[in-house]
C-alpha cells in the first residue's frame, strides 16, 4: 500500500515497485541475537534469514539496500560461494528521500561452534578474533564504526571485505576439516532521525564445498563419524560381510568387504 501511494515511488515501473517492496522488507529486518548465548552473537542467516520483519521500518524507510551483481536484485543478500582466501561484495544504498541519511557500519562474522565433533547450532562471532571485516568505497573509514552518508535522491556504494586469518584457518582444520560456513550480517545503524537501521546478510563457505563426502565411512573400513555406511540384506536388514551362521547379536568386528555376496 505504501509503495502504491507514496510519491517517493511514483516514478518506478510496476516491476520496480514489486522489487522495492522486497528490498525494504529484507533491508529493514532486524537480525536477532542468539538467546542461547551471552556473547551477543547473532543467529546465523542460515537460521534466521534476513532477520525479524519490522513492518514499521519497512513502511517508513526512505533508504533501501541492494547487493551489486546479486542474481535477484530485489533480495539484498550476498551469496559468496566457497573458498579460503576471503570474499568481497558491494552494497549500494539508495535514498529516495529529500534529505541525506547517515549510517554507522558494524558487522559479525559467524561460524558454527563445534563441540565433541558435532556442530552445535550456535555460532561464534570471529570478527576481530580470526576474521577481519573491512569497508571501502563510500565508507568514511575501513573498520567498525565507519560511517557512510547517502545524499538526498542519490545512492552510494560500500565495499565489504571478509578476510579469514590463520587463527580461523587453524580452528577449521582442527574441528571441521571438510570446511564450514562463514556468514553474518553487515549492519547500517542509522544516525538520522526517522530513518530505520538497515542490514544485509552474507553467506560464504570456508573450504571446498565439494570435499565433504556424501556418505559416512564404510562399516568395513571403520572410522565412521556418526553412522557407518554398509550393504544390507534387503529382506532381513542384516549387514552383509558377516558369517550368516553367526547370530546378529553375537557378531564382532567389522564386516568383511570381500564377503559381500549379491545375487539376483
Question: What kind of region is each of these model predictions?
Answer:
Residues 37, 115-119, 212-216:
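Outer-membrane beta-barrel and related beta-rich outer-membrane complex signature
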Residues 55-101, 107-109, 172, 214-242, ...:
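Beta-sheet-dominated interaction scaffolds and their linkers
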